[in-house]
Amino acid sequence: MAPKKTTKKGGPQKRPSAEKRILTAQKRYLINQSFKSKAKTMMKKFEAALKAGDQSSITSGLQLVYSVADKAVKRGIFKNNKAARIKSRATLRANVKI
């Protein structure tokens, strides 16, 4: 491991703000990817509930899809239109099965 760079007073060396932004962007990318994966998993569970045809699991799955889509918009991961499109398509599929 390389030795840490320090200033004359012994504290850690300051980073330029471009480096800070790169680090922040990398952290947010990983967090956003995990949330997108969670959203896709919830949608797959909803699709499985539709194939099974159980009404209670369909309604609970639809609630999960709504919740995840709204949280993604709140966090800035999905845009409003994408969440609306996801919820609309899920509702249409649920109404056909119920």
UniProtKB/Swiss-Prot annotation:
NCBIfam families: S20. HAMAP family: Ribosomal_bS20. Binds directly to 16S ribosomal RNA. Belongs to the bacterial ribosomal protein bS20 family. It comes from Chlamydia caviae (strain ATCC VR-813 / DSM 19441 / 03DC25 / GPIC). Gene3D superfamilies: Ribosomal protein S20. Transmembrane segments: none annotated. GO terms for molecular function: small ribosomal subunit rRNA binding; structural constituent of ribosome. It comes from the Bacteria. This is Small ribosomal subunit protein bS20. Residues 1-20 are annotated as: Disordered. Residues 1-12 have a biased composition (Basic residues).
